[in-house]
Amino acid sequence: MLILRGAPALSAFRHSKLLEQLSQKVPAVSGLYAEFAHFAEVTGVLTGDEQQVLARLLKYGPSVPVQEPTGRLFLVLPRFGTISPWSSKASDIARNCGLSKIQRLERGIAFYVAGQFSETEAQQIADVLHDRMTQIVLANLEQAAGLFSHAEPKPLTAIDILGGGRAALEKANVELGLALAEDEIDYLVNAFNGLKRNPHDIELMMFAQANSEHCRHKIFNASWDIDGESQEKSLFGMIKNTYQMHSEGVLSAYKDNASVIVGNVAGRFFPDPETRQYGAVQEPVHILMKVETHNHPTAIAPFPGASTGSGGEIRDEGATGRGAKPKAGLTGFTVSNLQIPGFEQPWEVPYGKPERIVNALDIMIEGPLGGAAFNNEFGRPALTGYFRTFEQSITTPHGDEVRGYHKPIMLAGGMGNIREEHVKKGEIVVGSKLVVLGGPAMLIGLGGGAASSMATGTSSADLDFASVQRENPEMERRCQEVIDRCWQLGDKNPISFIHDVGAGGLSNAFPELVNDGDRGGRFELRNIPNDEPGMAPHEIWSNESQERYVLAVGPADFERFKAICERERCPFAVVGEATAEPQLTVTDSHFGNNPVDMPLEVLLGKAPRMHRSVVREAELGDDFDPSNLDIGESIERVLHHPAVASKSFLITIGDRTITGLVARDQMVGPWQVPVADVAVTATSFDVYTGEAMAMGERTPLALLDAPASGRMAIGETITNIAASRINKLSDIKLSANWMSAAGHPGEDARLYDTVKAVGMELCPELGITIPVGKDSMSMATRWNDNGEDKTVTSPMSLIVTGFAPVADIRQTLTPELRMDKGTTDLILIDLGRGQNRMGASILAQVHGKLGKQAPDVDDAEDLKAFFAVIQGLNADGHLLAYHDRSDGGLLTSVMEMAFAGHCGLSLNLDSVAESSAEIAAILFNEELGAVIQVRQDATPDILAQFSAAGLGDCVSVIGQPINNGQINITFNGDTVFEGQRRLLQRQWAETSYQIQRLRDNADCAEQEFDALLEEDNPGLSVKLSYDVNQDIAAPYIKKGIRPQVAVLREQGVNGQVEMAAAFDRAGFNAIDVHMSDILAGRVDLNEFKGLVACGGFSYGDVLGAGEGWAKSALFNSRARDAFQGFFERNDSFTLGVCNGCQMMSNLHELIPGSEFWPHFVRNRSEQFEARVAMVQVQESNSIFLQGMAGSRMPIAIAHGEGHAEFESEEALLEADLSGCVAMRFVDNHGKVTEAYPANPNGSPRGITGLTSRDGRVTIMMPHPERVFRAVQNSWRSEDWNEDAPWMRMFRNARVWVN
């Protein structure tokens, strides 16, 4: 084993944060130093050259001075017997660099902690420094040799029920954490007595996972008695009723990993499977919809819990039909009170929590980062979501109880696209290869299906922790590339059947796969790729290692499938084959036995149906009279409540422009304020049709009226999605996610009544279907606090997500008030018809109350009329701005509109209030509704249209936007409230700032928060030195000559399709080239005029962002010669964007005239930054930027490591004077800046793009390829037609070639 010291592992900011955390736990800690430690398992002595290559490989990241360590060593390493994702990628890179003697590289962190502390304190320090699920802590470097020792497999265990009867199974139930019900234990005892043998632990574990509440949805399929009366339908039956009543537009419901609905026809853009040339195929582009929850893991370990939640939902989409493509994501969180230190709110009453779960604040710091990190690295934009906190003591017929979300809701959802011929699963022919695609088995997430089906606190802490999985998104990206290559083959798609691997691991996925295909299966346990050879059979079969899919591939298609996997470097293994008889057999060649041998019907067959007998219980509520509240103080409290406050801290960490198909993200207008009602994507690059998704949830209402909370969730989904241009209401399809504390007094009946209200009444009345959903039935947390039993139970919670095809993405409405459209009016549409019910409103909550009467959808006809009128007005161009009314009421709606429009408001309540006692209720009630901005001369006609639709009593003109930055509210000539917009916006942004300050670099958070005080910020703007609507490449395109450009990707790159689309539109033939093609000699770069290295996360940023990719080119002789030859040709051009920019900067020794280029390292904010930034094009030789110098315009940025680090101040100065700086960040006033967030990564002198001296090679961190169409921009100028300013860059390259 070789030991190689690495660079310091912590930035100054992370170092001081960790030191503070350690000294809080152990006050004796006085100092800390941390550096990476690398370990290499080698098969022979390395030569001098090989040692040099290895040393260069392991020098990565920012240049931080190395110290001589002092203090006690805590060496944190991956758990012995496991291979970390870092190791498998770094070892791949080493092999690609020709280091054949390196068996394996592994990395740890050596923490040196100074101070005098006891062994107990040392243990506390170790607990802070490592993740006990995947890591261990050692005391010296030599002990790391254990990383490379190979454990012997553990044997199978039989449970003696033939001898020990039922008692033996009861004991195993507890020891293995199986969560089997009494009737299931009886069922298994009978089944194995019938088979005349004892079950093995692997069979019981498999049965428990496959039949857990999590997988089988027993409550939703149960029969019911309520108050002694038998109910006709199951919960699932009532949901299916929506489909039975209105199935049009639904292509797949209830039977696959996601639902499929009809989409628009467009030119689907992808590479031809034979020629690898990108092009558009005109066909129906159908829409996948899916929303999952990952509540239990997120409570225990928020980052991996939320990350694997997103990963699992992405796999559900990819594994729909015969393979599909995820497109855009959403995330939601509901937690208990945050209690931010130093920012505690008056309504937050501390109640405590159990040790085993994380507090609400830490869930909201770590969980969103996990979800965003997975989506970012996979390459899926996160475009909408919600965030709510709720925790309150309420009065019930049994006394007071605390209701809240100690067990959080973590929602991960999204939409994708699928080809028409792949919607239905294919046939599994006998003899089909049964394949596992993706990562290896590891001992993580064991028993997750069963664990998430229990109330938090009823299983042991170790079992809880063991049930959380760990993530490797770059592996999932590789799997998706394989799936993409397969569906792109059309009728030659080798995948006949596919499922994702989720709860229960392969023990659930493989039986489900063969059973759904009406087959049996014979499997060999030792064929499963395994990074933890010491596992017992049940651990190999049931672990929930992530990023895996199971597939059936026909024998004739297998070689083609294998070639695809090898090109994409995606691991796969043939684990078994399909059999005609429905028997499940798992053999074990190591021990020479059959761990599983049972009929499928024993596993998946007639396990007993659950019956629930429950009673209804009254909701008591409490008295809440808002009429005497101080309006100013109420506004501040409401604006601080997380459900109302800015969600900026959740949004800027998530890439929102990847794919180049995003037409509407959360950030609105020139000031990029996070208030959008709906997310919208384009169907493809050649059309204006698209897809929309929006959410609705009003969970606290369920404590007063559960059915009302369900109806309001659907109502809010409709008022949100109405901002997009949808042809008819019935085009909207819903996902329903149900959360309940089953068994808690009254909750089962509330769940039943709400499902009935939604499934049997409201949805059929609206003509809307719910083709997909999920349930989580154990939403309670129990613990003992110094002898006192405590429980926190969630309200019955329905989260609704709406999806729909969009007729015109250019007509999406936003809340941004327009001050450039003359005199305008604000009109309130109040679907509550003046009832102003205040129950469970944010205003009630921030005063510690619940109220009595919940808002509700009283008449489905009103909602239908509202939707139709809004769509008509939008189609006719009458609506300048639109925002729904929701949490925080009318006041929040209009303030958010003013924040987005950077303007003031003059509101007059005379038309809606009869007395001053009603004012608070009018401003803060959360009845359904919306506010629209219209031109004043059109107001009478618009009011008449509402009247004609039967909504005349619902509409009132309530005021106008004004230019002076003041928000004034009057009634009967008296001022009710006045305040400055910028100060109110700071109140609204403060909760987000407080969390950002704790999570990221506090200096950056403060700069962004203080920037809100700037009254004269002009926002995003455009100043061009050329005509955006002129196509300078048109003459060359007309000649029909299309030069070839190589669109280069490495494993983990995810931005290649939109890059190809931009070059294709500029008149190039874009060709898909994988690094594996170059390393294998399948592709010759001499055939190309251009080469473009795309964005993403090559090798998951292992060995530095873009550095592993670059080094596999530098240190592989074939690749090095290919790249060097290409760069030296005078007729070639090269572009590197984002990850491609980082990669190219590390190839500068091969690129003539690039000696000034910097190295790109971690952003100054220490965070992934996804924003729209202003840049200025500099005077340079870049062939891409000719004729653009001096232009200032917005561009998409999305990166974690974009800070340009030069070797010295002198090198920076030299680069600056060389004429090689091509692009700089500027602020909204047009000045070059280093200030955050205008300069999102803190690069010196705003440098974010450079070129070689002759201009043939250009690198940049921002993403022009995502914003070349006008509709791709989060904010766009009305002067742009089809093209955005960045299209010129690609056309410049086309002109240069000629």
Swiss-Prot record:
Pathway: Purine metabolism; IMP biosynthesis via de novo pathway; 5-amino-1-(5-phospho-D-ribosyl)imidazole from N(2)-formyl-N(1)-(5-phospho-D-ribosyl)glycinamide: step 1/2
The Glutamine amidotransferase type-1 domain, residue ranges: 1045-1298
Top-level EC class as recorded in UniProt: ligase
TM helices/strands, residue ranges: none
Subcellular location: Cytoplasm
Binding residue positions for Mg(2+): 677, 716, 720, 884
Alphabetical keyword list: ATP-binding, Cytoplasm, Glutamine amidotransferase, Ligase, Magnesium, Metal-binding, Nucleotide-binding, Purine biosynthesis
Region (Disordered): 301-328
InterPro entries assigned: Class_I_gatase-like, FGAR-AT_N, FGAR-AT_PurM_N-like, PurL_large, PurL_linker, PurM-like_C_dom, PurM-like_C_sf, PurM-like_N_sf
GO biological processes: 'de novo' IMP biosynthetic process
GO cellular component, as recorded: cytoplasm
Active site: 1138 (nucleophile), 1263, 1265
Keyword Amino-acid biosynthesis assigned: no
This enzyme's EC code(s): 6.3.5.3
Annotated GO MF terms: ATP binding; metal ion binding; phosphoribosylformylglycinamidine synthase activity
Self-association state and partner proteins as the record states: Monomer.
Protein task: Phosphoribosylformylglycinamidine synthase involved in the purines biosynthetic pathway. Catalyzes the ATP-dependent conversion of formylglycinamide ribonucleotide (FGAR) and glutamine to yield formylglycinamidine ribonucleotide (FGAM) and glutamate.
Family annotation (NCBIfam families): FGAM_synt, PRK05297.1
Entry's family note: In the N-terminal section; belongs to the FGAMS family.
Protein name: Phosphoribosylformylglycinamidine synthase
Lineage of the organism: Bacteria, Pseudomonadati, Pseudomonadota, Gammaproteobacteria, Pseudomonadales
Gene encoding the protein: purL
